[in-house]
UniProtKB/Swiss-Prot annotation:
Primary localization class, coarse: membrane
Pfam family, one: SecD_1st
Task performed by this protein: Part of the Sec protein translocase complex. Interacts with the SecYEG preprotein conducting channel. SecDF uses the proton motive force (PMF) to complete protein translocation after the ATP-dependent function of SecA.
Organism name: Koribacter versatilis (strain Ellin345)
GO biological process: intracellular protein transmembrane transport; protein targeting; protein transport by the Sec complex
Identification of the protein by name: Protein translocase subunit SecD
GO cellular component: a single term: plasma membrane
Subunit structure of this chain's protein: Forms a complex with SecF. Part of the essential Sec protein translocation apparatus which comprises SecA, SecYEG and auxiliary proteins SecDF. Other proteins may also be involved.
GO molecular function: protein-transporting ATPase activity
Amino acid sequence: MKKNLTWKVVVIVAVLLVFAFGIIGNPAEVKWDKEGLKTALMNRIHLGLDLRGGTHLILQVVVNDAVNAETDRAIERIKEDLANNKVTYSDITKPDAANAPERIAIKGITPDGATTLRRVSDERLPEYSFGSGPEGSYTLTMKPAQLKDLKDRAVQQAIQKIRERVDSLGVSEPVIQEHGLGDYQILVQLPGVDDPARVKEVMQSTAMLEIRQVFGGPYSKESEAAQGQMQQPDTVVLPGKSESDPGTQVFYLVARSSAVAGHDLRQARVGRDQNGGANVQFNLTRDGGVRFSQFTSAHVGDKLGVILDGKVMEVANIKSEISDSGEIEGRFTDQQASDLALILNSGALPASIKYLEERTVGPSLGMDSIRQGVRAAIIGFVAVIIFMLIYYKGAGINADLSLLLNLVILLGFMGYFGAVLTLPGIAGVILTVGMGVDSNVLIFERIREELRNGKTPPSAVEQGFGHAWLTIIDTHVTTIVSAIILFLFGTGPVKGFAVTLSFGLFANLFTAVFVSRVIFDSILNRHQRGEALSI
């Protein structure tokens, strides 16, 4: 009996120490005073947006941008293949790029050319369906399954890129996840950020870097630039800034396709121009450098434009072959250059984003929530302790010790795994305490019943735990299943509640059944034969 108790007590003490370290961290690094303990606790238990204050954003991913980019690449492949097969056509366009970017129309093609087009599309573009359009035209439409997959991937890639950018800015404990079902939205919560202007700007930039040939400009009016498109096919008009007056918008006629793009970028960093101002210097990948070298050697004397997010940042003459590096000038401040380098290094967003909702929770509101939540938890916990002592006498001490260990395990778990404590999470802690009390009540009432039936204290304890065990398991398993469902389908605060409740219930199974039983056995081991049990 004593041997069994010894190893059980050792297990309980070990669990207590392990999770106590989870709450405060390394004891050697803790200052053992009020402020030191508070600091250690706050470093381990991270507060959520509703407690700490910060910014809540909901973003809409414009997934049609990703579809347009994909169909643009498909159009380039179609043009290349038709040219290789000597098939003529009058035009290849997207009739409704804004609302149906997945549809490509090919006009002015002969029936023989259409046969070649179908063969080429089946081989090179199997994700598109071939069809007939009006007036002898033909269409290629992206299949629904591929279209949905493309949009879903755009959202997941946007989440990853936004997370990388936010992490690089030093925002601690951000929540960045998909929001809603099939709405292509992203939830972003930034605890401790009450002025999100810079973070928003960094998140929203698509960071689409391109280098294209410039055919004309700067023009003071967009219509002047558009006239050049009549003589120069496969060009677009893009806005830029006047070199003499940066506040004035001008326009350039540039090539529709780029020589190199963002995916060819290897590294971006902050540098200095000839006047000591901040600029962004970049290096290209090996493949990008080869293509850039070939392009510049073939266009010596022509103009080259550095384009960021559809705006011409800089135009320069190609004086000689350029290999794998370049600079972006834009009269940047040091902060702007640093942010642009950060964005470029994280990679381009697959689609642009729009802000649907923005809410700022002030720190004062967060502190009020903390005080009210902690006050409610303390009042409830103290009331439970007093009730258990009054109603169950000596056994109430057993229950109270189990509940205290339950809280230590729960908070230690949050410290170890970096779980974020939210206001619903505090509610989960309180509910865990309630479930712990319920487990103890089931056990104690069963022990009382066995004692009234004339059983000895050791036998009553044995029977009480034995009969209450299945009921406790049943209630906890059903509640844990509900918490798992909340975690899978809920958002930030709801997930916090589910995580806190789930682990609290696992801890409760350990404390209510194992720890409480060990305490009873220790008491009975010291009792004289025939001595009554205080319960």
